[in-house]
């Protein structure tokens, strides 16, 4: 018996049969070993053939195991097994059957026909319901009238089952999400599919607009019979490129698989529509030196109209891959899929709502759906509807589900805090100094309070979780009943349809209403409804933009914004008021949604608080004064440096890195942008800023649009500072007019015209400097406290520092130098020499022209 005459699959099965015999301590490889190996073979055709011929596979497996257990076992044979006489006879019979069929290689399905001639196996197969006529029909169907002329012939069989996913079968079983709207695009696709030749639509659109959903909608329409006669009873198969490429080790294997798929499709004679998602992957797939890629293999079938194909790809990839291949492009008809409007998105979300409710076991309210569509459209600019809105709904529902399944956040926070306190308690118990004992007493008091609070909350949580009954189980049953009703309607099974429509479904709906009314009681810890607030929270977490409803505390904070900013910025009432009003307009939802929150030009002499106000604003909004995009415009003095802001153009070094300004805003869409010393930049930089100030958008070097609508743009400049110094006694409007005449000479009118407000900063007086000295000395007190020293400054000392630090030309900056020289330097010397001891009050006074420290 020449083993080379067997197909690859048959050879693998023989090896498995040998392993099975060795494992069972059998001396001979019997036919029962080989049939068991064939039945368990991955990707083999034996199991599908037996199923098609009406065999009972579980019974067959049991019978084969029983036969295996009857075989004699020989221990100590050293694993040497031989082929039994009966198996040799069956393999010879297989060879004879192959010659009758004019096959060059012996395939595994012929062994089934030969097995019927064997006494033992023949009895087992007949007992399991296998008849010779049925088996022969099943084999012929699998072979498809082809001879076995290749050792890999078995692997290319049933290519459609192996390498495609049946979307119509999934639609029949209700596994596809409902497709709402998109009638125009589906109608256009159907129109192209009905052509005589070149009947291949390709859906082109941005990622996330619903191209794949359109094909799923087409499959659902075919199943429901809502298509023209030419498309009725057709199957929509989705080509699985991963399965097609996976495991294709040798050259030509991928092409062989694809050719097998195309051959089977041509045999279907137009009854199958092949859907290729990401069709651009076909161009270049399997391409090696001298080999054809998949795109070229498709061309003849597409041109002749043998292959009904629907493709889907994005605009960029269509241009990059398919438009370059003009011969492939002309075989497809383009169907553009645009982004749906907010209203269409709301309709789509309402259709999907039930599926997401069943999956997450939560309830999604209508305001949440409206909020997901409107908020994602406004605040997520780099993605498309409906995908970004669906993501918001999905994530919000997931977070609610996570809360129900796991400990609620208040409980979790308390538990972590208790663990933290216990660890601290253990560490402090080992210390014996006064400070540690004091801290331990405070800590134990806090620990007791937290543990009591935790116990109370845990009881509430358990009670609420028990109250949430099984509405989701009823919802899943209801969804299943509706799917069954659709299947009954398609099969014209009116008895089952009426039973479901008038019996089962109304009963389930009644149960659901009762369960939901029981759940409707107010809950304190657990939430099971997704509302617009949850959607806003998810969006805020993802983008950093505060769109969630303002808490009372935040409202009060915004109303007292000037007061908060004045704690760090002394004087400059006009500037603080202008910035505060812009932030309040934005948070109240009154600002223009197509412009930045506010754009300001701060003018004034050096050291009066222009940059400090930006830092204070960033600290107010984000609790971190470094949370702002600070760009020193003095770095952009040359014309070519403009590209650093938006990124280098294609072909230049650094193209992939993106721009300094655009990348920072893409990562943090809600931020304060400080353009410091703006007058020092090249004039071309201002041309870039025109779009930012007017439309709140900027296109970077890679062609991506960056959204600036949630930023506060602040530019600082020293222009006209000499006029401010010289005319400090003038009233604010007159001074502003004077300074604006200088600004108008430096900046272009179109730039000045786009700025929301130009604010002139006043020079600082002596009383302002004294207040700033108080703020800066308070920071020094805080720094010293961390080292164990308690400082106190007398009024005389404050007056002296204010006097020394005052300079009408340089503003508040000399004050820092005065504090260093007059206070910090002597303090450092006294601490290092041991004259000042920790944990005691140090009074710093100004006596007889000297700053002295007393303890």
Curated annotation (Swiss-Prot):
Chain positions recorded as ATP 1 binding sites: 205-212
Q: Which is one Gene Ontology cellular component term of this protein?
A: cytoplasm
Q: Give the Clp R domain ranges.
A: 3-145
Which stretches does the entry tag as region Linker? Answer: 340-544
**Where do the record's region annotations for Repeat 2 lie?**
83-145
Q: What is its main location?
A: cytoplasm
- Cellular localization per UniProt: Cytoplasm
A GO molecular function assigned to this protein is: ATP hydrolysis activity
Residues folding into a coiled coil are 390-522
**GO annotations under biological process?**
cellular response to heat; protein refolding
Q: Where is this region: C-terminal?
A: 764-855
The annotated region (Repeat 1) lies at 6-71
Q: Which residues bind ATP 2?
A: 604-611
**Swiss-Prot/TrEMBL keywords:** ATP-binding, Chaperone, Coiled coil, Cytoplasm, Nucleotide-binding, Repeat, Stress response
Gene3D superfamilies cross-referenced by the UniProt entry: 1.10.8.60, Clp, N-terminal domain, P-loop containing nucleotide triphosphate hydrolases
**Where is the stretch described as NBD1?**
158-339
- Would you say which domain of life the source belongs to? Bacteria
Residues of the region (NBD2) are: 554-763
The subunit structure is: Homohexamer. The oligomerization is ATP-dependent.
Instruction: Tell me the protein family, please.
Output: Belongs to the ClpA/ClpB family.
Q: What is the stated purpose of this protein? A: Part of a stress-induced multi-chaperone system, it is involved in the recovery of the cell from heat-induced damage, in cooperation with DnaK, DnaJ and GrpE. Acts before DnaK, in the processing of protein aggregates. Protein binding stimulates the ATPase activity; ATP hydrolysis unfolds the denatured protein aggregates, which probably helps expose new hydrophobic binding sites on the surface of ClpB-bound aggregates, contributing to the solubilization and refolding of denatured protein aggregates by DnaK.
Task: Quote the entry's note on domains.
Answer: The Clp repeat (R) domain probably functions as a substrate-discriminating domain, recruiting aggregated proteins to the ClpB hexamer and/or stabilizing bound proteins. The NBD2 domain is responsible for oligomerization, whereas the NBD1 domain stabilizes the hexamer probably in an ATP-dependent manner. The movement of the coiled-coil domain is essential for ClpB ability to rescue proteins from an aggregated state, probably by pulling apart large aggregated proteins, which are bound between the coiled-coils motifs of adjacent ClpB subunits in the functional hexamer.
Tell me what this protein is called. Answer: Chaperone protein ClpB
């Amino acid at each position: 018996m020449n083993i080379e005459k067997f197909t690859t699959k048959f050879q693998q099965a023989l090896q498995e049969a040998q392993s099975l015999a060795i494992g069972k301590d059998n001396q001979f490889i019997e036919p029962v070993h080989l049939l068991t190996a064939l039945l368990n073979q991955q990707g083999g055709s034996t199991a599908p053939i037996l199923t098609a011929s009406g065999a009972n596979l579980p019974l067959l497996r049991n019978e084969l195991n029983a036969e295996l257990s009857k075989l004699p076992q020989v221990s100590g044979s050293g694993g040497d097994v031989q082929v039994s006489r009966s198996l040799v006879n069956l393999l010879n019979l297989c060879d004879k059957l192959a010659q009758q069929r004019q096959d060059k290689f012996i395939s595994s399905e012929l062994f089934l026909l030969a097995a019927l001639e064997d006494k033992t196996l023949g009895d087992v197969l007949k007992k399991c319901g296998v008849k010779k006529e049925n088996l022969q029909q099943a084999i012929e169907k699998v072979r498809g009238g082809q001879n076995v002329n290749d050792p890999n012939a078995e692997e290319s069989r049933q290519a459609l089952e192996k390498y495609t996913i049946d979307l119509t079968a999934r639609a029949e079983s209700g596994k596809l999400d409902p497709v709402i709207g998109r009638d125009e695009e589906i109608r256009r696709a159907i129109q192209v599919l009905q052509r005589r030749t070149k009947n291949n639509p390709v859906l082109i659109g941005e990622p996330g607009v619903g191209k794949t959903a359109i094909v799923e909608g087409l499959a659902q329409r075919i199943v429901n019979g809502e298509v023209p006669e030419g498309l009725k009873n057709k199957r929509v198969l989705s080509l699985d490129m991963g399965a097609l490429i996976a495991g294709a080790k040798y050259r030509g294997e991928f092409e062989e698989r694809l050719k097998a798929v195309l051959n089977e499709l041509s045999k279907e004679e137009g009854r199958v529509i092949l859907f290729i998602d990401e069709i651009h992957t076909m161009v270049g797939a399997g391409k090696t030196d001298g080999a054809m890629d998949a795109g070229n293999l498709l061309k003849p079938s597409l041109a002749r109209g043998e292959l009904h194909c629907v493709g889907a790809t994005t605009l960029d990839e269509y241009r990059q891959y398919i438009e370059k291949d003009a011969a492939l492009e002309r075989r497809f008809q383009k169907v553009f899929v645009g982004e749906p409007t907010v209203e269409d998105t709301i309709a789509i979300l309402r259709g999907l709502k039930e599926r997401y409710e069943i999956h997450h076991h939560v309830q999604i309210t209508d305001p949440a759906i409206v909020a997901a569509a409107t908020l994602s459209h406004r605040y997520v600019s780099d993605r498309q509807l409906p995908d970004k809105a669906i993501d918001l709904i999905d994530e919000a529902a997931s977070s609610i589900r996570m809360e129900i399944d796991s400990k609620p956040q208040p409980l979790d926070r308390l538990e972590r805090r208790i663990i933290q306190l216990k660890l601290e308690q253990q560490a402090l118990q080992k210390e014996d100094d006064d400070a540690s004992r004091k801290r331990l007493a405070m800590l134990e008091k806090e620990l007791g309070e937290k543990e009591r609070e935790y116990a109370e909350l845990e009881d509430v949580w358990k009670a609420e979780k028990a109250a949430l009954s099984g509405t989701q189980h009823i919802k899943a049953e209801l969804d299943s009943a509706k799917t069954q009703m659709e299947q009954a309607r398609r099969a014209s099974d009116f008895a089952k349809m009426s039973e479901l429509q008038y019996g089962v479904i109304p009963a389930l709906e009644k149960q659901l209403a009762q369960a939901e009314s029981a759940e409707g009681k107010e809950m304190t810890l657990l939430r099971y409804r997704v509302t617009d607030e949850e959607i806003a929270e998810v969006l805020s977490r993802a983008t950093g933009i505060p769109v969630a409803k303002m808490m009372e505390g935040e409202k009060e904070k915004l109303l007292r914004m000037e007061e908060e900013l004045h704690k760090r910025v002394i004087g400059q009432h006009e500037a603080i008021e202008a910035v505060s009003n812009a932030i309040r307009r934005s948070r109240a939802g009154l600002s223009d949604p197509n412009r930045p929150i506010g754009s300001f030009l701060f003018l004034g002499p050096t050291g009066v608080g222009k940059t400090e106000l930006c830092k204070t604003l960033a600290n107010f909004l984000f609790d971190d004064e470094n949370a702002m995009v600070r760009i020193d415009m003095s770095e952009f003095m040359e014309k070519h440096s403009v590209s650093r802001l938006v990124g280098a153009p294609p072909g230049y070094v650094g193209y992939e890195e993106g721009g300094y300004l655009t990348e920072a805003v893409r990562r943090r869409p809600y931020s304060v942008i400080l353009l410091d010393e703006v007058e020092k930049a090249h004039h071309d930089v201002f041309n870039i800023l025109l779009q930012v100030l007017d439309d709140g958008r900027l296109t970077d070097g890679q062609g991506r649009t960056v959204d600036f609508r949630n930023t506060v743009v602040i530019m600082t400049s020293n222009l006209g500072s000499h006029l401010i110094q010289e005319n400090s006694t003038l009233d604010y409007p007159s001074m502003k007019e004077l300074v604006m005449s200088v600004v108008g000479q430096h900046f272009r009118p179109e730039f000045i015209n786009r700025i929301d407000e130009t604010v002139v900063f006043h020079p600082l007086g002596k009383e302002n400097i004294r207040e700033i000295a108080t703020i800066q000395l308070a920071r020094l007190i805080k720094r010293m406290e961390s080292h164990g020293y308690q400082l106190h400054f007398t009024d005389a000392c404050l007056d002296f520092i204010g006097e020394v630090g005052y300079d009408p030309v340089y503003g508040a900056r000399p004050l820092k130098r005065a504090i260093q020289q007059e206070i910090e330097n002597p303090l450092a010397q006294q601490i290092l020499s041991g004259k000042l001891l920790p944990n005691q009050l140090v009074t710093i006074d100004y006596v007889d022209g000297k700053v002295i420290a007393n303890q």
